């Protein structure tokens, strides 16, 4: 799982570099492992409501913070872990047997607006 910070949208250059490296690794491993029938893809989630926010925010403030970010997403809501998991399950299925080396933006349309 990558992050959209790979495109330099993070205030942390180290974090952005690590995520960009993950994107490059995904593409290169896809090429290297294709002959063995192994597919390699990545998901790049937008803002997703997960327990990680409890590490740096008061629990009481998290719901309001997430709500304030709904309008940032073209689909009008912050993502859930289930949203990301469903995309991963799809990528693991035979329905995507011809997909490899792809970075999937799972972000309610944020990257579609920014490109």
Q: Model-predicted segments: where are they?
A:
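Catalytic loop of short-chain dehydrogenase/reductase
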Residues: 1-21, 26-27, 31-35, 47-48
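A conserved structural motif in NAD(P)-dependent oxidoreductases
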Residues: 73-84
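Non-catalytic, hydrophobic alpha-helical segments
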Residues: 84-85, 91
């Amino acid at each position: 799982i990558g992050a959209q910070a790979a495109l330099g949208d993070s205030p942390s250059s180290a974090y952005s570099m690590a995520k960009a490296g993950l994107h490059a690794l995904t593409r290169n491993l896809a090429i290297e492992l294709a002959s063995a029938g192994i597919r390699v893809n990545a998901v790049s989630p937008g803002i997703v409501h997960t327990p990680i926010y409890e590490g740096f925010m008061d629990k009481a403030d998290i719901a309001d913070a997430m709500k304030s970010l709904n309008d940032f997403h073209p689909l009008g809501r912050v993502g859930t872990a289930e949203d990301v998991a469903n995309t991963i399950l799809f990528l693991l299925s035979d329905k995507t047997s011809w997909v490899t080396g792809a970075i999937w933006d799972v972000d309610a349309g944020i990257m579609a607006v920014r490109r």
